[in-house]
Design a protein with these regions (language model features):
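Non-ligating segments of multi-cofactor redox enzymes
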Residues: 1-237, 244, 251-291
Length: 291
């Protein structure tokens, strides 16, 4: 499946111009991530893995520690390469089993017309800082006691929902289920605001090699369609993409290439019909209703 993901990434500009096929591919990949990588292979990464790695660098690195579980070792190797090339977005959006579970549940909720709540951007900007605070607290605790840090890392519902298939005592199950219930009404609340693993993977994102998500000069002003549609609110009102919060779902890229949906392209298409190629003035950009 690594080859499939690389194909998606390298040919994303072609795939996003076929929205129906792209959505089927994405949903199919998420099902694979949840059922095979997560529930079957138990390949759910955890902040505990990151803390163990950092502590091993401090106390004396030993390969044997990380070769005990080959699946986790291979997955971490793949994720490390992906983070260096594309940032954390690809892991969070495509390879995290709990993230896949949340997204699939939210997709089903939307199909059933469950009302969705959008967190005001001013609040969103402040709430996503919580996961970095959790990361710092866990890191500080791990320097004193790795065992204590591992217990505190139960802020992650991964062990309950993925590794143990919800077969735990009721407090852990209640916590995991509560996060999934909230996710029915607003997508990936845990990922956006509480996940210390996502925070840890976001730190090296600024060093990524590739920057393949396209934007237009009209993005943010006057057009704000993509930031209104972005389910994880990774696109700021000024139009730029915050890669430290992006999950690389490629929805904004499907809009970018769609001349029946992207307002600047709509204006350009109408201009061609009138016999000229000018993209039109910003004030001509049509208003698009966002549901």
């Amino acid at each position: 499946m690594s080859a499939v993901l690389l194909f998606i990434l390298f040919f994303q500009d072609w795939l996003v111009q076929k929205p129906k096929m792209m959505r089927w591919i994405r949903h199919g990949f998420l099902v694979y991530t949840l059922f095979f990588i997560g529930w079957y292979a138990l390949g759910q990464l955890s902040i505990v893995n990151v803390l163990t790695f950092v502590n091993s660098l401090i106390s004396g690195f030993k390969w044997e520690t990380f070769l005990i579980d080959p699946i986790m070792f291979v997955l971490w190797a793949v994720v490390a390469g992906i983070v260096l090339l594309w940032g954390r977005a690809v892991y969070c959006g495509w390879l995290c089993p709990f993230g896949a579970l949340q997204e699939l549940i939210n997709e089903i909720a939307r199909k059933l017309k469950v009302p969705q709540y959008t967190v005001p951007f001013a609040w969103h900007e402040r709430l996503w800082a919580i996961k970095y605070i959790i990361l710092l607290v866990l890191f500080g605790i791990s320097l004193e006691s790795m065992a204590t840090a591992e217990r505190m890392a139960e802020v992650e519902p991964f062990k309950t929902a993925i590794t143990l298939h919800f077969d735990r005592t009721w407090p852990f199950v209640t916590y995991a289920v509560l996060l999934l219930v909230v996710n029915i009404f607003t997508r990936k609340v845990y990922c956006r605001y509480l996940c210390p693993l996502g925070a840890a993977l976001a730190l090296p994102t600024k060093l990524r090699v590739f920057d393949w998500l396209k934007r237009r000069k009209e993005c943010g002003n006057p057009c704000r369609l993509c930031d209104k549609e972005c389910e994880v609110q990774a696109i700021h009102p000024d139009g730029h993409i915050n890669y430290m919060e992006c999950h690389y779902c490629l929805d904004c890229q499907m809009t970018y290439f769609d001349d029946h949906k992207c307002p600047p392209l709509i204006v350009k298409r109408r201009g061609k019909r009138r016999g000229h190629n000018a993209p039109g003035h910003p004030e001509e950009i049509p208003v698009v209703q966002v549901n």
